[in-house]
Amino acid sequence: IDWEQYIEKGKTFAVDSVVYSEEFRNSRFVTYKVKDAIVDQFREETGDRPNISVSNPDIRLHIHIAEDEATLCLDSSGESLHRRGYRQESVEAPLNEVLAAGIIMMTGWKGDCDLIDPMCGSGTIAIEAALIARNISPGVFRKEFAFEKWQDFDQKLFDEIYNDDSQEREFT
């Protein structure tokens, strides 16, 4: 893999791994080996070493090893998609946002009648219902997606798609 196509000079990266294998028993070992291979390739090709940022990398890579198969992925989302971005403070909700939205969609409710939230703890069902009723996309409150830091990211195209209100979400 030509990592220069994905990690620009001056950008940071991180690797995390999930391992289910007899050969590789330690996911941390796999993480370090992949990171070292990328750093070594950069040094050989450019003479520079890319920086690592575990907490807030520009580029995040995931490696998944299942027995004798490995999959290396470039993270396009960043923070987990179930974190919608509408909460000011982190609360421990017994029901995550994606599950709440799924439950509402399975009922067929679209905002054209009353909705009763029998759990009404942290308000996750009520908030997701309001978003569905107003046809507000789930990711609209996110500060950023990981793909926005990619070299080939097209801000103009993203803004065009992001701000396009011509398509309503269809729930079946």
Each predicted region: which residue ranges?
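Non-catalytic nucleic-acid substrate-recognition regions in nucleic-acid-modifying enzymes
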Residues: 1-57
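A generic beta-sheet turn/junction motif
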Residues: 56, 65-67, 122
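SAM-dependent Rossmann-like transferase core, predominantly class I methyltransferases
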Residues: 72-106
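A generic local secondary-structure boundary/capping motif
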Residues: 3-5, 51, 60-62, 106, ...
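C-terminal edge-of-domain segments
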Residues: 61-74
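Short glycine/proline-rich turn/loop motifs
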Residues: 18, 82-84, 169-170
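Conserved S-adenosyl-L-methionine
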Residues: 95-172
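Residue-level signature of catalytic and energy-coupling elements of molecular machines
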Residues: 15, 63, 103
